[in-house]
Structure formats: structure tokens, C-alpha cells
Amino acid sequence: MKRTFQPHNRKRRNKHGFRQRMATKTGRKIISSRRAKGRHSLSVSSDMGSRRQ
């Protein structure tokens, strides 16, 4: 049987990336709360940027 999680980096970035978070009010709240907590990575795309060419 096929598993439900089929990972793809593009889909991951598009759904949970920084630009996607900033597009909604609740997304901005998530980013600000992660900043306040002192998270090393704010979103998926923010730590993918260095690896992507």
C-alpha cells in the first residue's frame, strides 16, 4: 500500500515557506512567535535557501 507522505522539497517550500507564511495574518503570527522564542529557523524555506541553487 502506498504511504501518504511523499516528500517533495518544492511542495514543502510552497506550503510552509516564508513567503507563504507572510501571505496570511496567522502565518505572520507564526513567524513572529518563532522570532520571539528565538528559533534558529523561522520557516522551511529560510533554511533551504543556502542549499538551493
UniProtKB/Swiss-Prot annotation:
One of its GO terms (cellular component) is ribosome. Keywords: Ribonucleoprotein, Ribosomal protein. Residues 42-53 have a biased composition (Polar residues). It comes from the Bacteria. Disulfide bonds: none annotated. Residues 1-19, 26-40 have a biased composition (Basic residues). GO terms for biological process: translation. InterPro entries: Ribosomal_bL34 (IPR000271), Ribosomal_bL34_CS (IPR020939). It holds the Pfam family Ribosomal_L34. One of its GO terms (molecular function) is structural constituent of ribosome. Coiled coil: none annotated. Residues 1-53 are annotated as: Disordered. Belongs to the bacterial ribosomal protein bL34 family. This is Large ribosomal subunit protein bL34. It comes from Chlorobium phaeobacteroides (strain BS1).
